[in-house]
Amino acid sequence: IASPGPGNYITMAKAVASAVSMAGIETVQKGSFIQAHGSSTPKNCVSEADIFDRVAQAFSIRDWPVTAVKSYLGHSLGPASGDQLIGCLGVFRYGILPGIKSVSHIAPQVNNARLTIPLQDCKLEEGQGQIAFINSKGFGGNNATGVVYSPKLTHQWLRKRYGETVFANYQQRNRQVRRQANAYDEAASQGELNVIYRFGQQGINEEDIKIDMNGITIPGFEKPITYATDKQYPDF
């Protein structure tokens, strides 16, 4: 039976240390938040909160904001980390940390001494919400923690590295990309999706595939696919 392991302690601590090296300790302490795995099982609630609290203690973080998109969507399995990322992008854009509204109170066994787990939507103050830690806490050792930096912080770094002139040119070129993205979003919101679906078109005629003892010849490709001829087991 799978159970929590030490892996997530490692990934979470290394992710925070990485962010400290990039953005500085004060930005991490005052400007980061956690997008928890938050699968809401009894073991997950207790063990994940303990990881966050102990990492917070190690890096002198207080009142670390925690949210969990699964409280809205449930566990979408494979796409779950994508759900978390989309949620973080929303926090960056709107400055609102979604509350965990699926519970009436935080269970007493959850160690949240250094955490802030809002049960209602929370408006972040200026300077907060600059760094997101996306946590994946799979029982049995499948653990990962991703670090996502806000557009504001990223733009700050780009200006510092490339200068104002180069950054202004980038912003000018990016306007067209934004217009296209906004147009697509508007169309998608209206259900106007022109999906490209070309099943079987421009494919390879399977009858023209040639197979012999030396290899396989595929129409449209100059070189054939040859078989491996090295004898890996000479004693056989």
Regions from the language model: what does each represent?
Residues 1-236:
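Conserved "HGTGT" condensation-loop signature of ketosynthase/thiolase-family condensing enzymes
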